[in-house]
A protein has these predicted regions:
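Generic beta-sheet signal
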Residues: 32-34, 158
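P-loop (Walker A) phosphate-binding loop of NTP-binding proteins
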Residues: 10-11
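A conserved segment at the C-terminal end of the G1
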Residues: 17-30
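Active-site micro-motifs of SAM-dependent methyltransferase domains
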Residues: 25, 38, 164
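Amphipathic alpha-helical recognition patches that constitute DNA-binding helices
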Residues: 7, 18, 154
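Pre-Walker A (Motif I) flank of P-loop NTPase domains
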Residues: 2-5
Length: 195
C-alpha cells in the first residue's frame, strides 16, 4: 500500500463521523464513507459493547463485506451514520467480490476496499494514489495491531466530554426503543478512553 492509512478512533457519538465527513473534502484522501468493521470481518475479537464478537477462525471477509454493504444499501434511516441506498450498486459489488481473492489480513482488506468502493459507490472518486481514511469505532481495541501492520499509519483518537457523550449515545440508541441500560453505554465509553 503506497500511502499509509489514517484511522479515526473514538466511541459512538464522539464526533468520529463528523471528522470523517470533514476529511472527505481533502483531495489527497480516499475517505471510506461508512464503517467497514474490517477487523471484525477478519475474525478479530471485539469486546466493544455495541459490536461484540468472539474471535472467528474461519472468517470470510468478502462474504461479511457483502452483508454489511447490503445492510447499508437497504437503510432508509436518514439519521444513520451513512445512507448509500441509491448510490450503491449491489450487483456490481457481487460481481467484483466474485472475482477477488479472499482477504486474510488488514493490508489485503484495506486494498480490497480501495479497489472495490470507487467502482460500486456512485460519486466516489478513485482511490488511486490517495491515503485511505477508515473509521470504525471498535478499531480502538485493535489499534496496536493496526499500528504494527501499518507502521506509518496515523491515528486520530477523538475523546468527547464523557457526560455529553453519554447523553448523545443514550438519545441515539433510544430512537428505536427505550433508553438503553446505562451499564452498556458506560462500558462502550470506557473502552473509548483507554487507548
Amino acid at each position: 500500500m503506497p500511502h499509509a492509512p489514517i484511522f479515526i478512533l473514538g466511541s459512538h457519538k464522539s464526533g468520529t463521523s463528523l471528522l470523517r465527513s470533514l476529511l472527505d473534502g481533502h483531495p489527497d484522501l480516499f475517505v471510506i464513507p461508512f464503517e467497514t468493521h474490517f477487523m471484525a470481518l477478519l475474525g478479530r475479537w471485539i469486546t466493544y459493547s455495541y459490536r461484540k464478537q468472539a474471535p472467528v477462525d474461519d472468517a470470510n471477509f468478502l462474504e461479511g463485506l457483502v452483508e454489511i454493504l447490503e445492510s447499508y444499501a437497504q437503510s432508509v434511516d436518514r439519521q444513520a451514520d451513512v445512507v448509500l441506498g441509491d448510490r450503491l450498486d449491489m450487483d456490481a459489488v457481487r460481481a467484483f467480490v466474485g472475482e477477488m481473492d479472499e482477504a486474510d489480513d488488514p493490508i489485503q482488506a484495506l486494498t480490497v476496499l480501495k479497489q472495490l468502493l470507487p467502482q460500486v459507490v456512485e460519486g466516489l472518486d478513485s482511490a488511486q494514489g490517495k491515503r485511505a481514511v477508515e473509521k470504525s469505532v471498535e478499531h480502538l481495541e485493535v489499534a496496536l495491531e493496526l499500528a504494527q501492520t501499518f507502521p506509518k499509519a496515523q491515528f486520530i483518537h477523538i475523546v468527547r466530554n464523557p457526560y455529553a457523550n453519554m447523553v448523545a449515545l443514550r438519545k441515539f440508541k433510544a430512537k428505536d426503543q427505550a433508553y438503553p441500560l446505562i451499564n452498556k453505554v458506560y462500558k462502550s465509553l470506557e473502552s473509548g478512553y483507554y487507548w
